[in-house]
Amino acid sequence: MMMKFINIGYGNMVSAARIITIVSPDSAPIKRIIQDAREKGKLVDATHGRRTRAVIITDSDHVILSSVQPETVANRLYGSDDFSEEG
């Protein structure tokens, strides 16, 4: 079985099969989703202290913050800029 991982910046990877959506963090509803995830302990901050540019929501209700643009993450998801692991 082949698992596809997407690089979300600074050596961090997310399973492509678990991603539901990739959005910009600028709108008020997304900011509320981030705050709710923080309170529930389901927030993963992969920005390494940099500005959040993309918010990735997974099927397990985890919210992942990335400093990579949403368009870049989407291109990696649907393009050839990905990593695979057999397992």
From Swiss-Prot:
- Classification via InterPro entries: RemA-like
Write one Pfam family the protein is assigned to.
Answer: RemA-like
Query: Which HAMAP family would you find in this protein's record?
Result: RemA
**Family per UniProt?**
Belongs to the RemA family.
Instruction: Please state the span of the N-terminal signal peptide per the UniProt entry.
Output: none
UniProt-recorded name of the protein = Putative regulatory protein GTNG_1019
